[in-house]
């Protein structure tokens, strides 16, 4: 396997794309074989350094509207289909959001994203969030991101005009597995949102969740489908099973499995920010190994309904791995 890993690494470094079959062979690697596993991580790191350098990108998210979601995504604490006890509230007011944004900026965060529950936004609520973004643009130097569910082209244009630079919208899983994760909207709906955001001139941040009982083949399919979308950022969430959701009893992925997956993703999509997102605590401290194995960015602070890592601890750890912030 060692020679095969190096062969594929050299192919990527010649700026050639690896095939699905090649990635399938790569992900079959046994993580108990320390030599092969170390070479995989080292190779992913070389690819990251060649294409992306040593700049790490840190973002933070704010749960600007929580709970009561009409969609039935089986992993999600905010779906109205499941009694998870999640805090429920409408869109937060501008001053509360601005104070949080300024706090994050003072801690050295580069990007700030508002995330809202629900299938999408419209009418007065959407106008309110446009006004909030205009205020954030005027009163901070943060790069502004949005994660507001399904939007159309006109909404994407308005978000861009209000100061948003990046739209985040995960595919969650691959096309042929999506119906097992959500039935109230389609994979096609999500792809349309991503394409409309790009058409409006926004960068896109598109990732998914691993650990939802998908196969390794399905994980790879997701990565290849995301590669076709030409994204700037690829956030990797690790399922954190939430009580009273259909996935509450799913096993949490082992750290070595997560590290192997993110390393192979770097071979597939070499020129993006591969970003640790929700569920990172599943790595049990091995996240710093990932920063030497293809990962080069992170959501810092807490997530939507789960606890994350401290921002100062994250910055220290990332700098210690040789990155610049």
Curated annotation (Swiss-Prot):
GO terms for biological process: biotin biosynthetic process. Keywords: 2Fe-2S, 4Fe-4S, Biotin biosynthesis, Iron, Iron-sulfur, Metal-binding, S-adenosyl-L-methionine, Transferase. This is Biotin synthase. [2Fe-2S] cluster binds at residues 113, 145, 205, 275. One of its GO terms (molecular function) is 2 iron, 2 sulfur cluster binding. It holds the Pfam family BATS. InterPro entries: Aldolase_TIM, BATS_dom, Biotin_synth/BioAB, Biotin_synthase, Elp3/MiaA/NifB-like_rSAM, rSAM. Catalyzes the conversion of dethiobiotin (DTB) to biotin by the insertion of a sulfur atom into dethiobiotin via a radical-based mechanism. Binds 1 [4Fe-4S] cluster. The cluster is coordinated with 3 cysteines and an exchangeable S-adenosyl-L-methionine. Binds 1 [2Fe-2S] cluster. The cluster is coordinated with 3 cysteines and 1 arginine. It is an enzyme of class 2 (transferase). Homodimer. Its cofactor is [4Fe-4S] cluster; [2Fe-2S] cluster. The keyword Nucleotide-binding does not apply. Belongs to the radical SAM superfamily. Biotin synthase family. Its EC number is 2.8.1.6. Disulfide bonds: none annotated. Pathway: Cofactor biosynthesis; biotin biosynthesis; biotin from 7,8-diaminononanoate: step 2/2. NCBIfam families: bioB (TIGR00433). It catalyses: (4R,5S)-dethiobiotin + (sulfur carrier)-SH + 2 reduced [2Fe-2S]-[ferredoxin] + 2 S-adenosyl-L-methionine = (sulfur carrier)-H + biotin + 2 5'-deoxyadenosine + 2 L-methionine + 2 oxidized [2Fe-2S]-[ferredoxin]. CDD domains: Radical_SAM. Residues 51-280 form the Radical SAM core domain. [4Fe-4S] cluster binds at residues 69, 73, 76.
């Amino acid at each position: 396997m060692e020679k095969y890993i190096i062969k594929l690494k050299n192919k990527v470094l010649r700026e050639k794309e690896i095939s699905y079959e090649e990635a399938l062979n790569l992900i079959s690697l046994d993580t108990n074989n320390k030599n092969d596993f170390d070479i995989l991580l080292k190779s992913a790191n070389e690819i990251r350094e060649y294409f992306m350098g040593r700049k790490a990108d840190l973002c933070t998210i704010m749960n600007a509207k929580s709970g009561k979601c009409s969609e039935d995504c089986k992993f999600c604490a905010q779906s109205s289909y499941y009694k998870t006890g999640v805090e429920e509230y409408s869109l937060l007011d501008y001053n509360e959001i601005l104070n949080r944004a300024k706090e994050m900026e003072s801690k050295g965060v580069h990007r700030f994203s508002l995330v809202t529950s629900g299938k999408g936004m419209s009418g007065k609520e959407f106008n309110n969030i446009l006004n909030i973004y205009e205020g954030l643009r005027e009163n901070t130097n943060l790069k502004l991101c949005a994660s507001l569910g399904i939007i159309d082209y006109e909404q994407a244009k308005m978000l861009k005009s209000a100061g948003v630079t990046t739209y985040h919208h995960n595919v969650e899983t691959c096309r042929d597995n999506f119906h097992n994760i959500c039935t109230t909207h389609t994979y096609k709906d999500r792809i349309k949102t991503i394409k409309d955001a790009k058409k409006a001139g926004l960068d896109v941040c598109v990732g998914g969740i691993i650990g939802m009982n998908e196969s390794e083949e399905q994980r790879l399919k997701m990565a290849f489908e995301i590669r076709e979308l030409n994204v700037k950022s690829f956030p990797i969430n690790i399922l954190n099973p939430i009580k009273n959701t259909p996935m509450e009893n799913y096993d949490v992925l082992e750290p070595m499995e997560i590290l192997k997956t993110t390393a192979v993703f770097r071979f597939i999509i070499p020129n993006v920010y591969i970003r640790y997102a929700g569920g990172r605590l599943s790595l049990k401290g091995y996240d710093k190994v990932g920063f030497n194995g293809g990962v080069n960015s992170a959501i810092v602070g807490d997530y939507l309904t789960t606890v994350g890592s401290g921002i100062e601890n994250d910055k220290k750890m990332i700098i210690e791995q040789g990155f610049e912030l």
